């Protein structure tokens, strides 16, 4: 059901309504633009790109929009790094090289924090959550639960 709502898999029957609008056949990008966020169960398969930096993973859902991209489609790496640094501090993400740390080099708990920070920062209308605190320490679990709720 989670993959159907987020658009990762097509639904087999029925409809998915968001604020009365049928989103069943919409692309993942369109669902994101309508305000659907998704904290995935498998962070390494669907949640982030291990070869990308923290900054790139934070911007991945909106890389084509300002401030991450100009109207001509040129990426603004400074804006990406700035937002990532802000979220690294806010969510206590342990990233050795700050926003330029490769996501795959971080612990599973810190990878999870990157995903959670990205999704919460987007202020989604609907946040679909599967095991959001998996791999996190007790202090981080409490902080994340407060931010989600």
Where are the regions that the model predicts?
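Glycine-rich phosphate-binding loops of nucleotide-dependent enzymes
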Residues: 1-149
């Amino acid at each position: 059901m989670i993959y159907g709502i987020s658009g990762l898999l097509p639904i087999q029957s029925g409809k998915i309504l968001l604020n009365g609008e049928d989103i069943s056949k919409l692309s993942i990008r369109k669902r994101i633009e309508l305000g659907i966020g998704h904290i995935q169960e498998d962070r390494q398969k669907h949640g982030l790109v291990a070869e990308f930096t923290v900054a790139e993973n934070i911007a991945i859902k909106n890389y084509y929009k300002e401030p991450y991209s100009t109207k001509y489609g040129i990426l603004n790496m400074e804006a990406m790094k700035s937002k990532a640094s802000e979220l690294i501090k806010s969510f206590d993400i342990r990233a050795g090289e700050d926003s330029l740390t490769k996501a795959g080099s971080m612990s599973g708990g810190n990878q999870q924090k990157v995903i959670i920070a990205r999704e919460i920062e987007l202020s989604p209308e609907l946040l679909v959550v599967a095991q959001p605190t998996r791999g996190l320490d007790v202090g981080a679990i409490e902080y994340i639960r407060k931010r989600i709720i």
